[in-house]
C-alpha cells in the first residue's frame, strides 16, 4: 500500500500465471509509483491510496501453470464466491477490498488471440448506470490519446444488459463497490497497431504502458474534480 489520498485504487495482475506481461506491467507501475522524483507519482500519491498486488497467483506462476492456481482453479472465475480451499488468493484480496472499499480498479492480463492492447469493462452488470459507464469510457479515451500502443476498435464483445459474469473480478468489483473497474489486456507476441520487428511486445513496452496508464489515471482524477 502507498499514498495519502482518499481515492481507493486497486491494481492487481497475473491472475492467470502464464500471462507474464502482466507482471512486467506491474514492475513499470511500481517503479513509477515509488519514484520520489516522478511528478505523476507524487500527484497520484497525494490523491490516492494505492493497493497493489503484483502477482495474484504465485503458486501457479511457480508451478508453470497457464491459467490456474495450485488447486487447478481459474482465479478469475472465483470472485463471486471465493473459498479458502479453492481460491484463497481471491478470498484474501477480496476481503481486503471489503475493508478499504474500491473506487478504481485495474486487473492486468494478456490475451493470446487479439494482437492489441485493449480494455474490457463491466457493461452487463445488474447495477449498470450510464454515469458509471461514462467514467470507464472516459478513461479509455484518455489512454487512447496518451499512447499509440492502446486502441479501442479491437477487444471483447460487450455483455448485454444484466448478463455480466459476476465471477470475474472486473464485473464483481463494479457491482459490489460501484467501482470504475476494468481489465487491461496486452498481446503475447506483438501489437499489430504498432509492430516492432526486433522485439515485438516486450517487457519494456509493458512497463511504459503502465506509466501511461498511471498518467491517464491522474488526468482522469483531475477531470473528476472539475
What is each of the regions a protein language model found here?
Residues 1-165, 171, 181-186, 192-199:
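Active-site/substrate-binding loop(s) of hydrolase catalytic cores
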Amino acid at each position: 500500500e502507498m499514498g495519502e489520498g482518499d481515492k481507493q485504487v486497486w491494481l492487481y495482475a497475473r491472475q492467470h500465471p502464464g500471462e507474464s506481461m502482466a507482471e512486467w506491467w506491474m514492475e513499470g507501475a511500481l517503479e513509477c509509483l515509488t519514484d520520489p522524483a516522478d511528478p505523476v507519482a507524487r500527484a497520484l500519491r497525494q490523491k490516492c491510496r494505492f493497493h497493489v498486488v503484483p502477482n495474484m497467483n504465485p503458486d501457479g506462476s511457480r508451478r508453470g501453470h497457464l491459467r490456474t492456481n495450485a488447486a487447478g482453479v481459474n482465479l478469475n472465475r472465483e470472485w463471486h464466491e471465493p473459498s479458502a480451499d479453492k481460491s484463497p488468493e481471491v478470498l484474501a484480496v477480496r476481503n481486503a477490498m471489503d475493508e478499504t472499499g474500491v473506487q478504481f480498479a485495474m486487473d492486468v492480463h494478456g490475451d493470446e488471440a487479439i494482437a492489441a492492447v485493449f480494455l474490457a469493462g463491466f457493461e452487463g452488470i445488474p447495477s449498470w448506470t450510464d454515469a458509471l459507464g461514462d467514467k470507464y469510457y472516459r478513461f479509455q479515451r484518455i489512454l487512447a490519446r496518451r499512447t499509440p500502443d492502446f486502441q479501442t476498435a479491437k477487444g471483447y464483445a460487450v455483455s448485454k444488459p444484466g448478463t455480466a459474469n459476476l465471477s470475474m473480478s472486473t464485473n464483481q468489483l463494479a457491482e459490489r463497490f460501484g467501482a470504475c473497474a476494468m481489465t487491461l489486456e496486452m498481446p503475447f507476441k506483438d501489437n499489430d497497431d504498432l509492430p516492432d520487428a526486433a522485439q515485438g511486445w516486450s517487457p519494456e513496452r509493458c512497463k511504459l504502458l503502465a506509466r501511461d496508464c498511471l498518467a491517464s489515471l491522474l488526468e482522469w482524477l483531475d477531470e473528476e474534480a472539475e
